[in-house]
From Swiss-Prot:
UniProt key word Disulfide bond: no
Gene encoding the protein: ATP25
Topology in membrane: Peripheral membrane protein
GO biological process annotation, one example: mRNA stabilization
Lineage: Eukaryota, Fungi, Dikarya, Ascomycota, Saccharomycotina
Cellular localization per UniProt: Mitochondrion inner membrane
One GO CC term on file: mitochondrial inner membrane
Official protein name in the record: ATPase synthesis protein 25, mitochondrial
Transit peptide feature range: 1-14
Pfam families the record matches: mRNA_stabil (PF13929), RsfS (PF02410)
Family indicated by similarity: Belongs to the ATP25 family.
Keyword Mitochondrion: yes
Keywords on record: Membrane, Mitochondrion, Mitochondrion inner membrane, Transit peptide
Function according to Swiss-Prot or TrEMBL: mRNA stabilization factor specific for the 0.95 kb OLI1 mRNA. Also involved in OLI1 ring formation.
Length: 612
């Protein structure tokens, strides 16, 4: 039987021993060992030295190793020193492109030092050949790729990086791939409703929800010096192989996966089909130059279904559930516009108030900033609203809802904007063609023209002096034979003084038509003779065909006889006018109305010209 033995201590001596001490259990007797030899103090005389030496020999033992709980602090110190050494080594090996901004160095130190991200790579996208330009080249200058240990590590790294950017550069990062708890729970519910995960995720059916949640890819736009940061888990990084996408042409071979079977994937399948190859899809996006929509086709069909039924609550839910980037919002608004265009083309009665509210609700400031795509879309949408209900969406509403809004947001008005307003003014119907209603319309035009002061066209001319604009302005000054603005004649005289011999055919035709509409034939002939070239100037290029048609359509026999008998038509031969088949038909119709069909004058004007 094993015995437990203790060292003998003498009763007349006081012993003090330092702790700790241990009890060693062996097959033999149990002994109590102390690290330090015990020191004793005695009150005896000379015999104390002999007794003390005897006890000291018995109390001297072999020292043991330092216990684990005393080695914890030392181990932590060694670990911290090792991390510091590794960090210094990593900083030495960290390759940053030359002439890169200091912000890139600070971000790199944060990612590799404090956040502990591995496999740090930086690609300089500033100098690329035109043949290898992708969408990322136009967005950023530096592409950073690094590896995290888990999805939580990715998320934590993004949060710390965002805090760092706000503190150091006063910039807020934009991230793709960051799923919050609500989105993640919604994602899990959708996966639970799907029996075939491969159709939903584009991966092998062996993939599970656990595998999906264990991998992550955060793409972060730092909004500082064109720096983009990609934080991926190791498996996702191996699968995507973004290095091959962003590397220069002469270095792509370094990052190519020679044996795809050795690359770990989420599904664990060695063979990757072309439909499931994410890198192949990224290559296509980089090489092609087309506008790409991220809207789900099913979502588009559902949105169209609700819009055709004018169920705006359901349409709002679909748009809000699929909200994304500014380009995505432009696509959605364009789809709304196309649906309204189809309904208006079918002459269906639509709720213009709800359609306008739907478009305005989803026209955010970020979407409006996409001026190249947004404002032409809004202009076309406004024209459709006016066509659907001119009384509700009138010219005055268009002036405030489009022209003033666009001008107040710092956007430049263009020629098409003014033309759209003038066309709406002409379409607006009033209960009676009175002079006061015409004045009201003219006030809207005056307010609009004040917004276009100083604007130039592509030909360095004023927008107001555009040929189409002048024609529409003249048409807006005349309602019928009895109602016209008093400024009509002043406007015509101003046009003649401004353009002189450079009057275009469109301007001349518009002046003739409006004078014929008010039946002011004397002013019409005065204008026509004022632009008559002399015989030495060459061929007459006035719009003779339109002039004769205006006279013939008036149906006034007195005016027609005056044109024929006073010799106005003889100028066609005198000035070598190019007699086209259309002009021949117009001359015959005019002479037939005047009762001079098959006359000598017709033979002289038409047949004589044909013989030449």
């Amino acid at each position: 039987m094993n015995k437990f033995c203790l060292l003998p201590f003498h009763g007349k001596r006081i012993g003090v021993a330092n702790i700790p001490f241990t009890i060693l259990f062996k097959k033999g007797p149990y002994f109590l060992h102390s690290h330090i030899t015990a020191v004793y103090y005695s009150t005896k005389g000379k015999n104390d030295s002999h007794e003390q030496s005897r006890v000291s020999k018995k109390s001297t033992f072999t020292p043991l190793e330092t216990p684990w709980y005393l080695r914890i602090v030392d181990n932590e110190k060694e670990l911290m020193e090792g991390k510091k050494n590794n960090h210094h080594t990593m900083n030495k090996e960290l390759e940053i492109p030359k002439t890169s901004p200091n912000s890139l160095r600070k971000i790199a130190d944060l990612l590799t030092g404090k956040l502990g991200l591995d496999d740090f790579l930086v690609f300089d996208l500033r100098k690329k050949s035109p043949n290898s330009v992708s969408a990322v080249n136009k967005l950023g200058d530096f592409m950073v790729i690094c590896t995290a240990r888990s999805t939580k590590h990715c998320h934590k790294s993004f949060l710390e990086l965002n805090k760092f950017l706000k503190h150091e550069f006063c910039s807020s990062a934009y991230v793709e791939g960051n799923f919050n708890e609500r989105q993640e729970s919604r994602r899990k519910r959708r996966l639970a409703r799907k029996s075939n995960l491969s159709k939903l995720l584009g991966r092998s059916s062996e993939c599970s929800a656990k595998d999906l949640n264990s991998e992550a890819w955060y793409m972060i736009d730092c909004r500082v010096d064109g720096i983009f940061v990609n934080i991926l888990t190791q498996r996702r990084r191996n699968e995507l192989n973004l290095e091959e996408l962003y590397a220069p042409e002469n270095e792509k071979s370094k990052f190519q996966n020679i044996d795809s079977g050795n690359v770990p994937t989420i599904s664990g399948v060695n063979e990757i089909s072309s439909n499931n190859n994410i890198l192949l899809g990224l290559r296509r996006l980089a090489q092609q130059r087309r506008r790409y929509s991220t809207i789900n086709p099913n979502g588009l069909s559902n949105l169209r279904y609700f819009l055709q039924k004018e169920d705006f609550k359901g349409a709002n839910k679909i748009i809000q559930s699929s909200s994304g980037t500014e380009t995505h919002n432009i696509r959605t608004l364009e789809h709304v516009k196309n649906t309204l265009k189809d309904l208006v083309g079918q002459e269906r009665k639509v709720d213009v108030v709800q359609w306008k509210s739907l478009f305005d609700e989803h026209s955010t400031f970020l979407t409006i900033n996409q001026s190249a795509a947004y404002w032409p879309l809004r202009l076309e949408y406004a024209i459709l609203l006016n066509k659907a209900d001119p009384q509700f969406y009138s010219d005055r509403v268009f002036l405030k809802d489009y022209l003033l809004l666009k001008k107040s947001l710092g956007q430049e008005l263009i020629r098409e904007d003014l033309i759209a307003l003038l066309e709406m003014v002409l379409k607006t119907q009033h209960s009676s063609h009175s002079y006061f209603n015409l004045v009201k319309q003219n006030r809207v035009i005056i307010r609009a023209l004040n917004l276009f002061k100083g604007l130039q066209t592509e030909d360095d001319g004023s927008v107001v002096y555009d040929e189409v604009v002048i024609s529409l302005l003249l048409n807006s000054m005349v309602a019928d034979e009895r109602v016209k603005l008093r400024s009509l004649y002043e406007t015509i005289d101003h046009i003649f003084q401004t353009f002189g011999d450079k009057l275009t055919s469109g301007m001349i035709v518009s002046i003739l038509q409006n004078l014929a509409k008010i039946k002011d034939w004397n002013k019409l002939l005065q204008v026509w003779e004022a632009i008559t070239p002399t015989e030495g100037e060459g061929q007459d290029k006035r719009p003779w065909n339109e002039f004769i048609n205006v006279i013939n359509q008036s149906g006034d026999s007195h005016v027609i006889s005056k044109i024929v008998n006073n010799g106005h038509l003889l100028w066609i031969r005198r000035l070598n006018v190019n007699v086209t088949p259309e002009l021949c038909n117009s001359i015959k119709a005019l002479l037939k109305t005047a009762g001079m069909e098959n006359s000598t004058l017709e033979e002289f004007l038409v047949r004589g010209t044909n013989n030449q």
